[in-house]
Design a protein with these regions (language model features):
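Solvent-exposed loop/turn segments at secondary-structure junctions
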Residues: 1, 31-36, 93-97, 162-167, ...
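Gly-Asp-aromatic-enriched flexible segments
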Residues: 349-426
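Aromatic-lined carbohydrate-binding/catalytic grooves of carbohydrate-active enzymes
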Residues: 15-157, 162-167
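Carbohydrate-binding surface patches
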Residues: 270, 276-279, 284-286, 320-350
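Extracytoplasmic, non-cytosolic globular domains
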Residues: 146-196
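Glycan-recognition surfaces
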Residues: 115-121, 134-135, 141, 145, ...
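Structural recognition of the beta-strand scaffold that forms the well-ordered cores
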Residues: 23-30, 35, 86-91, 151, ...
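Catalytic cores of secreted or luminal carbohydrate-active enzymes
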Residues: 271-320
Length: 426
């Protein structure tokens, strides 16, 4: 939320030098670029926003100095285009509340901001905007003026936020934005956010947007990765050229303005990159490119995997056997197939036949003790598996069983006294 022009140029320089040849091409400035006092990960109800006299947002000059004197993003856009890349921005749905408070005119019309604002349509998490009432005269003109300005800046990509949910309430504004882009005279990729979009809107969103989020913000947690398997499967029938279900950014490398590195393990990062590619989700890197490590670079420059994302055909789920999941796709101009196989299970599965010893069944209805006599002197790891075979309840077995070691000298030690690497419920 607080990125600057200098930081944006640094990202673009890295992409041009290291990633462009692998197909990476968009540099996108995210939310709050119009707020001089923006802070990381926060929105302020009383924030002063930069606007022109027609209620159209402008870059904050203190953060984007090339925007001075009403130049907007043209200077930054020209810089990025000069590197052979494309430039994008984030945009909140609607019209700035400040424009409504000042009742600024809608460019080229007799109408004003208060004539078109819907004060009952507000974002639940960002206080900057009111929705636009598309039944009012001047409403389409306002969106036309916004995208005329954006096109004049040389913008190639716009992510419109607070518009994809609740989807049906915002359909008219989505249609208005599509019309505004189509008449602006410049090809602009339209991305809609946030998810989770509803499947019954699939035909509408594919007609009006080039990509749309299928989830809320995706961050670096395994549970978030796991949930994307089902979402990408559900949206797969609606993917088509020029219309892409978007599983969100790749949270790799250094994140949060350099404050931390990704929490995903290397295997989990491989899973994300592979799933996004075989499902042909748009690829947007969310980390600081200038701090890219060798492993992250290897993910972003794997030409074989990127070819699947960019060029494969007929991508589809193949099977899901107890969360052992496979996707396949056709290789263009070939009878060959791509195959991606994932272990999406949350927990380690232990095969009983590999156990050195399995105790008798112990339940509330059986004897309360079971003696286990097994030599573990050469073992380096121990797994205690509590199986709910007896009565269907597993979560409290470790409590009431109170398992313990009994040593040769007769002394005892509860297993709970030992340091365990991890615990999972079955």
């Amino acid at each position: 939320t607080a990125i600057t022009e200098a930081q944006t140029k640094a990202q673009a320089d890295y992409m041009a030098a290291n990633l462009k040849k692998f197909g990476w091409e968009y540099i996108v400035v995210d939310i709050q670029w119009y707020e001089p006092g923006a802070k990381d990960h926060g929105y302020r109800p009383d924030a002063v926003l930069m606007m022109d006299g027609f209620g159209r947002l402008q870059p904050a000059v203190n953060r984007f100095p090339s925007s001075a004197d009403g130049k907007g993003f043209k200077g930054l856009s020209d810089y990025i285009h000069g590197l052979g890349l494309k430039f994008g921005i984030h945009l909140m749905r609607g019209i700035p509340r400040q424009a409504v408070d000042k009742n600024l005119p809608v460019k080229g019309t007799i109408y004003h901001a208060r004539d078109i604002a819907n004060k009952n349509s507000v974002c639940p998490w960002n206080p900057d905007m009111y929705g636009v009432d598309m039944t009012k005269p001047g409403a389409q003109d306002y969106y036309n003026s916004v995208f005329d300005l954006i096109a004049a800046w040389g913008v190639d990509f716009v992510k419109v936020d607070d518009i994809a949910r609740p989807y049906h309430e915002h359909e008219k504004e989505i249609e208005a934005i599509r019309r505004a882009i189509d008449r602006a005279g410049r090809p602009i990729v339209l991305s809609l956010s946030p998810g989770e979009n509803v499947l019954d809107a699939a035909d509408h969103v594919a007609k009006h947007a080039n990509m749309w989020r299928i989830s809320d913000d995706f961050w670096d947690r395994w549970l978030a990765v796991h949930d994307q398997f089902a979402r990408l499967k559900n949206w797969n029938p609606y993917r088509q050229p020029g219309a892409w279900p978007d599983a969100d950014m790749l949270p790799f490398g250094v994140l949060d303005q350099g404050k931390r590195t990704t929490r995903l393990t290397p295997d989990e990062q491989h899973t994300v990159m592979t799933l996004w590619s075989i499902a042909r989700s748009p690829l947007m890197h969310g980390g600081d490119l200038t701090k890219t490590d060798d492993f992250t670079r290897s993910l972003l420059t794997n030409a074989d995997v990127l070819a699947v994302n960019q060029n494969s055909l007929n991508n589809r789920p193949l099977f899901d056997h107890d969360e052992l999941i496979a996707w396949t796709a056709d290789v263009p101009d070939s009878e060959d197939k791509y195959l991606a196989v994932f272990n999406a299970r949350d927990r380690v599965r232990l095969a009983a036949e590999h156990a050195r010893y399995a105790s008798p069944l112990v339940t509330r209805a059986s004897d309360s003790k079971a003696a286990i006599d097994v030599d573990v002197s050469d073992a380096s790891r121990m797994f205690l598996v509590l199986d709910p075979t007896g009565d269907g309840v597993a979560w409290d077995y470790g409590v009431w069983l109170a398992p313990r070691f009994v040593f040769a000298d007769g002394s005892e030690r509860p297993l709970t006294d030992y340091q365990w690497t991890r615990t999972d419920a079955i």
